[in-house]
Amino acid sequence: NLDLWLNGEADVRARLHHAAAHNDLILIEGVMGLFDGEPSAADLAQRFGIPVLAVVDAGAMAGTFGAVVHGLRHYRPRLPWAGVMANRVASDGHMEMLRASVRADDLGVEPGGIDAGWLGGLRRDAAFALPERHLGLTVASELPDALARLDAAADALAATPLGQIDTAA
């Protein structure tokens, strides 16, 4: 739990240091929205220089996707930005509309040489979709096929530009 309010900066720094010593990649999932709460996931990212990968539910949008990305990208200008990925994409054509809606100035290279670009999208797929319920997702222990769903999601991610990034570089 990387909670700056509950645990304090020193504890969060120690947890990140420990995780970095034992892993090639650290993935931190924010709760609610990127800028929601005090401190927010954006506060955590900015405090520790953690690049933000915005995963945006694109299931019911096309051109608006670019506006959402632009807002996330520029709302706090000094926020480290890794790029954007679309979720719940309906088709290849939908994927192209989403990609085309993202403005060139919302992509590019960040200070420090991080390529902050279009990192692809995940199609709607029952093989890895998680059932939702009020106040959250179904927990893994309630899904007899949880590992198969996780494997399907990993395979889908591996086929995206995000999945092609060499974490050893």
Where do the protein language model's features map onto the residues?
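Internal gly/pro-rich beta-alpha loop/helix module
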Residues: 62-169
